[in-house]
């Protein structure tokens, strides 16, 4: 089995061309048809979900503009990775290193390997709206400072191996997650709903929203659950890459979050022509992509107003709980 804890690129030469980028450590890939869509091309319900997805940036990659604006520092995807001509999204910018989702009024959920410690927390910025909003348009890389948030503290984090397994060193195949308290309450974006009910099953449809390779936001559906039996995570055939780490994975039917994209197969391959291509597999091929199950951390995510408690059946039996993540006990596990 390939080493799962690795940088986005499989080619050593490509790694040398990434001095300013720090992608998520777990690679991902394309299965069957490439289902990644731009924000503007997605269905309206997917756009609504996308508005609550964030990209993670280093503070040093965000330039302050006056008055009250910011500019994201990016590089050209194709040039930086020496992509072959014709590769999808080749001329777009890259710069984000992880993805995440708003699950409370000041609470973001991501992968545990995206924010490893207090130093990583202090250096990270969470940005809403990094996407291509109009057909023929360019990625939004200049925005108001109100769309940029800092990490105030790590509320809860876990990155560990699957219990009772004989995984090779470095292949932490268990759950991988972090809940991040922001420096202030989010305005203009709504927290997303998570599944607190029945588990997914093999064959259920799922969709991922995030920032593959640090690109502007992409929506990728057309995927299904391959194996839900793993401890702390499930396996799927999602079209994802490094940079997608931390992306929310939604139940295509219910539109609720079912998990967090955390790792997968090789992202890129060297072509005989000497350039880099995206790694592709048959729809049922490859090792699949791993998704932390939302059930392992849902108890630490505040309920949305009007959300039912487990076992409640009547329309009148609704509990409304304030979405204040400050009530959560900070718990930082060792990476």
Region spans (language model):
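Boundary/junction segments of secreted and surface-exposed precursor proteins
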Residues: 25-49, 310, 317-327, 332
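Sec/Tat signal peptide C-region and signal peptidase I cleavage site
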Residues: 20-24
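Short beta->alpha transition motifs characteristic of CBS
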Residues: 111-115, 210-213, 242, 259-267
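Serine endopeptidase catalytic core focused on the charge-relay Asp
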Residues: 26-41, 48-89, 93-94, 103-105, ...
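Bacterial N-terminal signal peptides
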Residues: 10-19
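C-terminal cap/linker of serine protease catalytic domains
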Residues: 132-133, 139-142, 146-150, 185, ...
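Catalytic nucleophile loop of clan PA
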Residues: 101-102, 199, 240-262
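Bacterial N-terminal signal peptides that target proteins for export
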Residues: 1-11
């Amino acid at each position: 089995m390939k080493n799962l804890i690795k940088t986005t690129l499989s080619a050593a030469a490509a790694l040398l061309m990434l001095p300013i980028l720090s992608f998520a450590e777990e690679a991902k890939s394309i299965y069957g048809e490439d289902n990644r869509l731009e924000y503007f091309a997605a269905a309206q319900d997917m756009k609504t979900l996308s508005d609550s997805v964030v990209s993670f940036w280093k503070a040093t990659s965000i330039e302050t503009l006056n008055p009250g604006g910011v500019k994201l520092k990016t590089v050209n995807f194709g040039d930086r990775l020496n992509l072959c001509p014709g590769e999808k999204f080749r001329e777009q910018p890259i710069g984000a290193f992880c993805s995440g989702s708003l699950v409370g009024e000041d609470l973001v959920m991501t992968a545990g390997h995206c924010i490893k410690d207090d130093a990583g927390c202090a250096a990270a910025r969470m940005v809403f709206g990094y996407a291509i909003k109009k057909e023929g348009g360019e990625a939004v890389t200049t925005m108001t400072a109100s769309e940029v948030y800092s990490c105030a503290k790590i509320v809860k984090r876990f990155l560990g191996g699957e219990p009772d397994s004989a995984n090779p060193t470095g292949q932490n195949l268990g759950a991988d997650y972090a809940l991040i308290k922001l420096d202030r309450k989010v305005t203009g974006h709504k927290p997303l709903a998570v599944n607190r009910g029945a588990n997914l099953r093999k064959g259920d449809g799922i969709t991922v929203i995030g920032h593959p390779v640090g690109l502007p936001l992409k929506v990728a559906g057309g995927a299904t659950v391959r194996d839900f039996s793993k401890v702390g995570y499930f396996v799927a055939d999602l079209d994802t890459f490094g940079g997608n780490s931390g992306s929310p994975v939604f139940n295509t039917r219910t539109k609720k979050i079912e998990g967090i994209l955390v790792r997968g197969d090789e992202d890129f391959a060297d072509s005989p022509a000497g350039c880099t291509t995206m790694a592709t597999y048959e729809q049922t091929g490859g090792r699949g992509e791993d998704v932390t199950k939302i059930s392992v951390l849902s108890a630490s995510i505040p309920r949305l107003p009007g959300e039912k408690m487990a076992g409640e059946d009547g329309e009148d039996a609704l509990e409304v709980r304030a979405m204040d993540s400050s009530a959560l006990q900070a718990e930082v596990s060792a990476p």
